[in-house]
């Protein structure tokens, strides 16, 4: 194993139709420079990341930022880290994080009946 997922930083809840940002922190735990990438899904739907892959120095931690639009249900994000062995991407680590759907409460207006007067 070369690419250790340190954490998934994402909100614990989000309203439907909002963009959810997912930051996956990955550390190169090998003694050599490594090409590292991250893939992830929410439930079974994949989502994009800012970088395809990065060259990471030994001991260095990098953040891969991904995003998706929150569906109308709770989701589980699963992320995988991968390192390049010279000819193939090798899966190194996996981590999950649950994100709950938040129901937005309609805001009550400050409008008052007394604001009207008869003409």
Regions inferred by a protein language model and the residue ranges of each:
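Asparagine-centered strand-capping/turn motif at beta-strand->loop junctions
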Residues: 26-30
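Short acidic/proline- and small/hydrophobic-mixed sequence motifs that coincide with surface turns
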Residues: 31-36
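Short, hydrophobic beta-strand segments
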Residues: 64-73
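Viral virion structural and adsorption modules
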Residues: 106-119
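Structural beta-strand segments of beta-rich domains
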Residues: 18-22
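Short beta-strand segments of immunoglobulin-like
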Residues: 9-14, 116
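Enriched for extracellular/lumenal, surface-exposed ectodomains of secreted and cell-surface proteins
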Residues: 77-97
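Solvent-exposed serine/threonine-rich low-complexity stretches and specific carbohydrate-binding patches
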Residues: 46-59, 98
């Amino acid at each position: 194993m070369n690419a250790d997922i340190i954490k998934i930083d994402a909100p614990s809840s989000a309203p439907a139709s909002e963009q959810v940002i997912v930051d996956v922190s990955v550390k190169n735990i090998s003694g050599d420079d490594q090409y590292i990438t991250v893939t992830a899904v929410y439930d079974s739907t994949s989502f994009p990341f800012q970088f395809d892959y990065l060259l990471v120095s030994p001991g260095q931690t990098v953040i891969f930022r991904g995003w998706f639009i929150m569906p109308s249900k709770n989701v589980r994000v699963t992320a995988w880290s991968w390192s390049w062995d010279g000819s193939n991407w090798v899966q190194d680590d996996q981590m999950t994080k649950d994100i709950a759907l938040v129901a937005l409460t309609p805001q009550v207006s400050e409008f008052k009946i007394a604001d009207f007067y008869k003409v």
